[in-house]
Amino acid sequence: LAVVLTLLPETHPVTERRVLPRKRDLNPLAQITRVIGNPAVGRLALSFFLFFLAFNGFTAILVLYFKQQFNWGPELATTAFLIVGVVATVVQGGLIGPLVSRFGEWKLTLIGLGLVIAGSLLIPTTDPEQARSGVFTAVAILASGTGLVTPSLRSLVSRRLSNEGQGAALGSLQALQSLGSFLGPPIAGVAYDLLGETSPFFGGAGLLMLVMLLVSRSPLEETAA
């Protein structure tokens, strides 16, 4: 280490070196506020948070809903989540690249949101006598939509920022995802108890429609910031 520090020359150009950030700039809440307030990506960042708030809300009560509405045990509930895992792996592991090349991230985000909305509405409207086919179809649709939305929306934010701003923005997106995932389940649980078993699904679908509106009104062109 001493040899490296004393003998090896600095190769990073002086003009490209960054000034160390101030302590207040490292505050995660300040970074989140800055990203949401950025006109280039603010709507998309807010959409990212609202998406995970809604999605993690109604998915958190799925097992309870399956038990109370369809009298499902662990086996059928596990099968439903297994379908989610398989479909999500196929979409994100093999299909997302060709689909982005053909449709672009913006259209894929809207398509994915439409699929998630459809899946979230199909679950509470499924006839108990057709529960297996209805629910398994619904969760496959949900997984397909989520597999499209998450990488596409993240890429939309990244492409609208300069290289210097991408790291902080993507870190803020991760924080927004965690915050939505943290707040969604308890909110859905309260709605489940106070407003009825289907309220998290219909409420989540309504929130996702707002997300779709925000994304659809975001600029299509890339904007460096």
Residue ranges and their predicted role:
Residues 9-46:
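Juxtamembrane intracellular "pre-TM" segments in multi-pass secondary transporters
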Residues 165-193:
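A late C-terminal transmembrane helix in Major Facilitator Superfamily
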